[in-house]
């Protein structure tokens, strides 16, 4: 399962990973800069970091004071340990000039100070409300594959993750099935396709969290639903129909007729594209 951000709808992003003609894209492909420049100092700084393919750690604060100063010193010291991998950005949420930044991350009511780690593609990869620890600063830097999946999931989209390379069998069939699913009008706007090389050492930790071996000799296709729950894993050859059936089964099992009733849950606690977004999760 992907790491879940703290239960703050405040840090949800609604930015989508671009697809080309319904085809899955490689996690390491260059992407458009997700941030506008000139709308606020914070977003301009984020755009600069993304342009240089660097992470950004944003220190959100509200009022000056001894406590804020101590937290800022801890933040600065922690960022120094990350070297040139990340830029440090400070945003005062009460500054009118930073309204666009505050609105982008929906942090106006978040407990302060708040630190967010943001990948070059715009995904929030880690959040530290109130208590940022230098020892865990590096946890915000994740692989390209993890960041790509997080970005799509934070946009409330499903992810169809194709794990394959030139050595895995059935790669062509699996990729064709994924492309067919992503081209289906029922899912085209509700899913993202991402391709990962299982032998990429940078993706080892992420793939291990999904129980995918880096030495797999068969293509693997993993379906993820927000906030990061694996719904299904297909090994080797798979068809578009099989993927659609798994999604349909997951939807119909918790939302009969595409409508989420009281006490019903959908994969990841969220309904699919044809379902109501107000579904409540069932308490265990």
Model-based region annotation:
Residues 21-27:
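Sec/Tat signal peptide C-region and signal peptidase I cleavage site
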Residues 54-57, 99-117, 157-160, 204-226, ...:
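Structural micro-motif
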Residues 60, 83-99, 187-204:
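Thiol-based oxidoreductase modules, predominantly thioredoxin-like and allied folds used
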Residues 114-146, 224-256:
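Non-catalytic, surface beta->alpha helical segment in thiol-disulfide oxidoreductase systems
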């Amino acid at each position: 399962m992907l790491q879940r951000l703290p239960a703050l709808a405040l840090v949800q992003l609604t930015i989508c990973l671009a697809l080309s003609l319904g085809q899955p894209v490689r996690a390491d492909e260059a992407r458009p800069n997700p941030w506008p420049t000139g709308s606020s100092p914070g977003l301009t700084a984020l755009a600069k970091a993304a342009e240089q393919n660097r992470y950004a750690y944003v220190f959100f604060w509200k009022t000056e004071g001894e406590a804020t100063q101590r937290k800022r010193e801890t933040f600065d010291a922690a960022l120094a340990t990350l070297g040139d991998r990340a830029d440090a950005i400070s945003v005062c949420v009460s500054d009118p000039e930073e309204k666009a930044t505050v609105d982008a991350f929906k942090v106006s009511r978040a407990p302060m100070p708040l630190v967010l780690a943001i990948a070059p593609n715009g995904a929030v990869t880690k959040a530290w409300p109130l208590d940022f620890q230098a020892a865990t600063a590096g946890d915000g830097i994740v692989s390209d594959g993890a960041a790509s999946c997080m970005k799509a999931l934070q946009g409330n989209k499903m992810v169809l993750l194709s794990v394959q390379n030139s050595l895995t069998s059935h790669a062509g069939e699996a990729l064709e099935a994924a492309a067919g699913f992503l081209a289906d009008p029922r899912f085209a706007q509700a899913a993202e396709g991402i391709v990962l090389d299982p032998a990429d050492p940078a993706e080892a930790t992420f793939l291990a969290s999904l129980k995918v071996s880096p030495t797999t000799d068969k293509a693997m296709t993993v379906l993820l639903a927000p906030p990061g729950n694996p719904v299904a894993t297909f090994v080797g050859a798979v068809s578009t129909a099989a993927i659609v059936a798994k999604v349909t089964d997951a939807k119909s099992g918790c939302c009969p007729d595409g409508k989420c009733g009281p006490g019903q849950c959908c994969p990841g606690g969220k309904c699919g594209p044809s379902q109501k977004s107000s579904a409540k999760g069932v308490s265990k």
